[in-house]
UniProtKB/Swiss-Prot annotation:
A zinc finger (RING-type) spans 29-70. Interacts with MOAP1. Interacts with CDKN1A. This is E3 ubiquitin-protein ligase TRIM39. SMART domains: BBOX, PRY, RING, SPRY. Keywords: Apoptosis, Coiled coil, Cytoplasm, Metal-binding, Mitochondrion, Nucleus, Transferase, Ubl conjugation, Ubl conjugation pathway, Zinc, Zinc-finger. Autoubiquitinated. E3 ubiquitin-protein ligase. May facilitate apoptosis by inhibiting APC/C-Cdh1-mediated poly-ubiquitination and subsequent proteasome-mediated degradation of the pro-apoptotic protein MOAP1. Regulates the G1/S transition of the cell cycle and DNA damage-induced G2 arrest by stabilizing CDKN1A/p21. Positively regulates CDKN1A/p21 stability by competing with DTL for CDKN1A/p21 binding, therefore disrupting DCX(DTL) E3 ubiquitin ligase complex-mediated CDKN1A/p21 ubiquitination and degradation. InterPro entries: B30.2/SPRY, B30.2/SPRY_sf, Butyrophylin_SPRY, ConA-like_dom_sf, PRY, PRY/SPRY_TRIM39, SPRY_dom, TRIM/RBCC. One of its GO terms (cellular component) is nucleus. It catalyses: S-ubiquitinyl-[E2 ubiquitin-conjugating enzyme]-L-cysteine + [acceptor protein]-L-lysine = [E2 ubiquitin-conjugating enzyme]-L-cysteine + N(6)-ubiquitinyl-[acceptor protein]-L-lysine. It comes from Rattus norvegicus.
Length: 488
């Protein structure tokens, strides 16, 4: 059976070769015996190269014979055969392929076409190899059969591959859309956060005004009671002064005069012993113990955002002295030592930066300013000029709140924004929301909002501390970074 298949395969290969030979003959010119060039068909139906048949009939004026069948035609009739021209090109290509296949598909041992396939050795073999001792016991089939079988197997593999390719293509397209979707989600969340904090600020401001109004009402109530009690005590004081004068006068009288109404005087003195002298308490009964619980939650949120800020001596102006724990800074008129002029160090503006800057997120820290009369706190961007004279404004990379002359507060915008602060802050809270582009300042002393800068931050931001120049004993105190105080 195997030998029959091999013989059939050999016959099939021979038949294919014969068909190719016939195609080459049909595509050849009978005059030049080469492939037809610009094939034309004459009246008898035979085809020739246009140039060949033209030369063949060159000296004739009538009765033009066919070079093949010798049939003559009265006229020089040459009709282009474009379809045959296409077949000629195909024949040329097939000849090239045949030559290539012949060169590549010959058995290296027997120089016969590799027309069969051995399953066991997974290799192409020729007819002689197939009946040899090496492959006689193997399963050998015609190359076309093996090709068809493996083609079907490959096609079965192709479907899941195409499905997986489609899945990956869809997934990739989905992933490529996600940055835009993420941007929209982030912007939506950003607007939500801004809206929530705006509402929170509004409610805090309202609550602040309510509490301050209640505090003022309580102050007026206590002042009224103090005035009334002072008037009452004034009346008692006058009564007692009159009684004391009366007693002194009695003591100077003669016996008859003294005894005349001494009992009445003694009764008055006795009543004085039981007279109650009361004072008005100025203790504030209405305090922050009733502060709404939702704002304690805000404080808890801020606690989670507390930044561990320490001062960087490499940035400190030479006239600034830092504490050992790098939490405090103060100005000294005489430099204690010469410091290297590094690129990070400020040489004109007497300030110092923190050791850590921020390029994202939300961060909160507090600075104790005490009774100082001159200071500034805030942030600056990484690229600010640190040498020579400068103007610390948002346009130059500085966002600050400052105090000078003991009572003048301002946000250092262009121009300065005066800040009307009712209660002098002993401690200032600073809240940076990098993505939202906000930097907020709070008076920790009375828990009020001072000012908020709104900008677009594109660089690393560094916490900045300016203790002010030493102008009097009060401003000699340092600026100190403190852990945030509790509101609870």
């Amino acid at each position: 059976m195997a030998e029959t298949s091999l013989l059939e395969a050999g016959a099939s290969a021979a038949s294919t070769a014969a068909a190719l030979e016939n195609l080459q003959v049909e595509a050849s010119c009978s005059v030049c015996l080469e492939y037809l060039k610009e094939p034309v068909i004459i009246e008898c139906g035979h085809n020739f190269c246009k140039a060949c048949i033209t030369r063949w009939w060159e000296d004739l004026e009538r009765d033009f014979p066919c070079p093949v069948c010798r049939k003559t035609s009265r006229y020089r009739s040459l009709r282009p055969n474009r379809q045959l021209g296409s077949m000629v090109e195909i024949a040329k290509q097939l000849q090239t392929v045949k030559r290539k296949i012949r060169d590549e598909s010959l058995c290296s041992q027997h120089h016969e076409p590799l027309s069969l396939f051995c399953y066991e050795d997974q290799e192409a073999v020729c007819l002689i190899c197939a009946i040899s001792h090496t492959h006689r016991a193997h399963t050998v089939v015609p190359m076309d059969d093996a090709t068809q079988e493996y083609k079907e197997k490959l096609q079965k593999c192709l479907e899941p591959l195409e499905q997986k390719l489609q899945e990956i293509t869809c997934c990739k397209a989905s992933e490529e859309r996600k940055p835009g979707e993420l941007k929209r989600l982030v912007e939506s969340r950003r607007q939500q956060i801004l809206k929530e904090f705006e509402e929170l600020h509004r409610r805090l401001d309202e609550e602040q005004q309510t509490l301050l109004s209640r505090l003022e009402e309580e102050e007026q109530d206590i002042l009224q009671r103090l005035r009334e009690n002072a008037a009452h005590l004034g009346d008692r004081r006058r009564d007692l002064a009159h009684l004391a004068a009366e007693v002194e006068g009695k003591c100077l009288q003669s016996g008859f005069e003294m005894l005349k109404d001494v009992k009445s005087t003694l009764e008055k003195c006795e009543k004085v012993k039981t007279m109650e002298v009361t004072s008005v308490s100025i203790e504030l009964e209405k305090n922050f113990s009733h502060f709404p619980r939702q704002y304690f939650a805000l404080r808890k949120i801020l606690k989670q955002l507390i930044a561990d800020v320490t001062l960087d001596p490499e940035t400190a102006h030479p006239n600034l002295v830092l504490s050992e724990d790098r939490k405090s800074v103060k100005f000294v008129e005489t430099r204690l030592r010469d410091l290297p002029d590094t690129p990070q160090r400020f040489t004109f503006y007497p300030c110092v930066l923190a050791t850590e800057g921020f390029t994202s997120g939300r961060h909160y820290w507090e600075v104790e300013v005490g009774d100082k009369t001159h200071w500034a706190v805030g942030v600056c961007r990484d690229s600010v000029s640190r040498k020579g004279e400068l103007t610390p404004l948002p346009e130059t990379g500085y966002w600050r709140v400052r105090l000078w002359n003991g009572d003048k507060y301002a946000a250092t915008t262009t121009p300065f924004t005066p800040l009307h602060i009712k209660v002098k802050p002993k401690r200032v809270g600073i809240f940076l929301d990098y993505e939202a582009g906000t930097l907020s300042f709070y008076n920790v002393t009375d828990r009020s909002h001072i000012y908020t800068f709104t900008d677009t931050f594109t660089e690393k931001l560094w916490p900045l501390f300016y203790p002010g120049i030493r102008a009097g004993r009060k401003n000699a105190a340092p600026l100190t970074i403190r852990p945030p105080t509790d509101w609870e």
